[in-house]
From Swiss-Prot:
Region (Disordered): 1-37, 184-204, 279-299, 313-347, 380-449
UniProt main location, coarse: secreted
Disruption phenotype annotation: In a rabbit ligated ileal loop model, mutants do not induce formation of A/E lesions.
Gene name as annotated: tir
Membrane topology annotation: Multi-pass membrane protein
Localization (cell): Secreted; Host cell membrane
Protein name: Translocated intimin receptor Tir
Cross-referenced InterPro entries: Tir_central_sf (IPR037003), Transloc_intimin_rcpt (IPR022638), Transloc_intimin_rcpt_C (IPR022639), Transloc_intimin_rcpt_cen_dom (IPR003536), Transloc_intimin_rcpt_N (IPR022633)
Length: 538
């Protein structure tokens, strides 16, 4: 493959003579045969520039590349490390971002520009900050991913192989994470996604969400009904007391009575004095004394008959006063008794109705609240949510070529086993992270084949969330050899054709990935333009 060396190799400190060109059978960039090979690294590993497409002199209107997000012509180069394994050439990205990814793992980092014009990427892990200097190609690639200029990115794991760290914008990974959470949250609904074109690789997804939960005691309407009944009873008692104090007949005063004997004596004495006074005014009512000369002189004493008459009239007046006193006392007592009886009747009626009903309401509300609380304590089940998700994958007939999973030395996986491996059971998840923290839901997707079998249930969820964006294909190879190659591109387009061609020509070997081969039709296949949003993974 025609290459251009970066000029240094951080893995080799000793001076090494220039290496000869790599075998011509691995030349996958046939359109760049006129480029010179300059290398001062070892034969097994060296840093280089690799042309992404057929030639760097492609037409200016060709905006697609095998790696979404890289700038268009003439900057379509990737800083890589090439390793020779037998007759197969395997490429790895090597640069500041790889150094930073090795230090901080799959986490957030930011890009800053220093005063001297250099660009640095800064990440943090376990309280330690790591800073690396970015090359112009790396900085341009990151700029193409971040048109908004937020300069915050996330390593999303080795999606294309253990040696290649994928990068996306932090806001995009947060959006993708939220979409995954939304997919996992139960909504007590049944969703069915019918399969699309049988040859498109789309699957039939059936989701059944069953949520069983018991509301808290405070959310039970029966409790609030009981409390409202108690409140109504208390209000009724207060209203009854106010009505008895204001609206009912007032309590009568004690009756005013007069002693009949005292009234008779008083009246008799008064009448006697009055009659005696009137009798003295008439001289005929007085006794007469005859003096020496024979003249009649009043003696100043009333005659006996007049005195008797006065006494009789005074006695009659006293008796009349006695009767009047007795009658007055009787009327006063009768009035008191009537008013008191009326008040007692009103009090009895109001107390029986007002306090009785209010007391019954309070008692009923208290019993209802107690029973409701007891039932909640007795019948409170553990809140549980069951989410059943069945994925039936309709594999196309040419699945090996479309997915790029051809294994030239291992047994072919049957469609039935692939469908069975895609059936999964997922339970709901909760989001307790703050908005300032970006968690990476794709951090564990770049795992070996044997580890992926235990967690195969997670991949359909991620693939469903990113059904339409440009995701890189995950390459899993059998055997004990480590996965050292990388594969980047858009599923279903040029990159799969490349792998199909390499598999048929023997360029793809067991346990190794990479872009190798000897045809021009594969590498010249145009891919779709990068999709904006959380799909931009490189």
């Amino acid at each position: 493959m025609p290459i251009g060396n970066l000029g240094h190799n951080p893995n080799v400190r000793a001076l090494i003579p220039p290496a000869p060109p790599l075998p011509s059978q691995t030349d996958g960039a046939g359109g760049a045969r006129n480029q010179l090979i300059n290398s001062n690294g070892p034969m097994g590993s060296r840093l280089l520039f690799t042309p992404i497409r057929n030639s760097v002199a492609d037409a200016a209107d060709s905006r697609a590349s095998d790696i979404p997000g890289l700038p268009t012509n003439p900057l379509r180069f990737a800083a890589s490390e090439v390793s020779l394994h037998g007759a197969l050439e395997v490429l790895h990205d090597k640069g500041g971002l790889d150094t930073l990814n090795s230090a901080i793992g799959s986490s957030l980092f930011r890009v800053e520009t220093r005063d001297d014009g250099s660009h640095v990427a800064i990440g943090q892990k376990n309280g330690l900050e790591t800073t690396v200097v970015l090359s112009e190609q790396e900085f341009s690639s990151l700029q193409s991913l971040d048109p908004e200029g937020k300069n915050k990115f996330v390593f999303t794991g080795g999606r294309g192989g253990a040696g290649h760290a994928m990068v996306t914008v932090a806001s995009d990974i947060a959006e993708a994470r939220q979409r995954i959470i939304d997919k996992l949250e139960p909504k007590d609904t049944k969703e069915t996604k019918e399969p699309g074109d049988p040859n498109s690789g789309e699957g039939k997804i059936i989701e059944i969400h069953t949520s069983t939960s018991t509301s808290s005691l405070r959310a039970d309407p029966k409790l609030w009904l009981s409390l409202g009944t108690i409140a109504a009873g208390l209000i009724g008692m207060a209203a009854t007391g106010i009505a008895q104090a204001v609206a009912l007949t007032p309590e009568p005063d004690d009756p005013i009575t007069t002693d009949p004997d005292a009234a008779a004596n008083t009246a008799e004495a008064a009448a006697k004095d009055q009659l005696t006074k009137e009798a003295f005014q008439n001289p005929d009512n007085q006794k007469v004394n005859i003096d020496e000369n024979g003249n009649a002189i009043p003696s100043g004493e009333l005659k006996d008959d007049v005195v008797a008459q006065i006494a009789e009239q005074a006695k009659a007046a006293g008796e009349q006063a006695r009767q009047e006193a007795i009658e007055s006392n009787s009327q006063a007592q009768q009035k008191y008794d009537e008013q008191h009886a009326k008040r007692e009747q009103e009090m009895s009626l109001s107390s029986g109705v007002g306090y009785g009903i209010s007391g019954a309401l309070i008692l009923g509300g208290g019993i209802g609240a107690g029973v409701t609380a007891a039932l909640h304590r007795k019948n409170q089940p553990a809140e549980q949510t069951i989410t059943t998700r069945t994925v039936v994958d309709n594999q196309p007939t040419n699945n090996a070529s479309a997915q790029g999973n051809t294994d030239t030395s291992g047994p072919e996986e049957s469609p039935a086993s692939r469908r069975n491996s895609n059936a999964s059971l997922a339970s709901n998840g909760s989001d307790t992270s703050s908005t300032g923290t970006v968690e990476n839901p794709y951090a564990d997707v770049g795992m070996p084949r044997n580890d992926s079998l235990a967690r195969i249930s997670e991949e359909p969820i991620y693939d469903e969330v990113a059904a339409d964006p440009n995701y890189s294909v995950i390459q899993h190879f059998s055997g004990n050899s480590p996965v050292t190659g990388r594969l980047v591109g858009t599923p279903g387009q040029g990159i799969q054709s490349t792998y199909a061609l390499l598999a048929s020509s023997g360029g793809l070997r067991l346990g190794m990935g990479g872009l190798t081969g000897g045809g021009e039709s594969a590498v010249s296949t145009a891919n779709a333009a990068p999709t904006p949003g959380p799909a931009r993974f490189v």
